[in-house]
């Protein structure tokens, strides 16, 4: 059976989402053991979070993971699997998983306007500019290489939620 978290409407950022997962049994595994972003990080998640080589989507009850010690990237963490199951996403948004597609549609129709503030913002604690002389995205972001045969490191989120036009069934 799926883990159901308390109804959430106060999750407005990744930090809060991770904290909610930390407080929900079985939803987050965190490690300080060094992991190499080249094939090792995704391999560890494959067995701990996804439950081995499985049909997609990822195992519904598998935890998200936070790696706090990334080889070559001191003081950097990587979160993986936060949105790995529809049930987890639904729990974080406080809706039933069958309502996610409709929620996405509603959000696209009524986007939230940005808020401008003169106060310190947590998302601006560290700022890197492409115009900085030492700017190098590959040194800043520990983008994983998922397999030894990948063309290189990449950041991606493949997500699709569709409803069959004739049957009304959603995937």
Describe the predicted segments one by one.
Residues 3-171:
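Extended, highly charged
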């Amino acid at each position: 059976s799926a883990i159901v978290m308390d109804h959430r409407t106060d999750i407005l950022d990744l930090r809060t989402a991770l904290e909610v997962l930390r407080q929900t049994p079985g939803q987050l595994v965190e490690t300080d053991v060094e992991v190499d972003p080249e094939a090792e990080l995704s391999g560890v998640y494959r067995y701990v979070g996804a439950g081995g080589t499985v049909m997609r989507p990822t195992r519904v009850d598998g935890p998200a993971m936070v790696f706090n010690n990334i080889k070559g990237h001191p003081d950097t963490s990587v979160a993986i699997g936060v949105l790995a199951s529809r049930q987890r996403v639904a729990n974080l948004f406080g809706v039933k998983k069958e309502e996610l597609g409709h929620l996405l549609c509603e959000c696209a129709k009524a986007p939230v306007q940005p808020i401008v503030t003169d106060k310190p913002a947590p998302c601006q604690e560290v700022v890197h500019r492409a115009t900085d002389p030492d700017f190098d995205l590959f040194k800043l972001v520990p983008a994983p290489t998922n397999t030894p045969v990948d063309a290189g490191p990449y950041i991606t989120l493949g997500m699709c939620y569709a409803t069959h036009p004739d049957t009304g069934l959603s995937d």
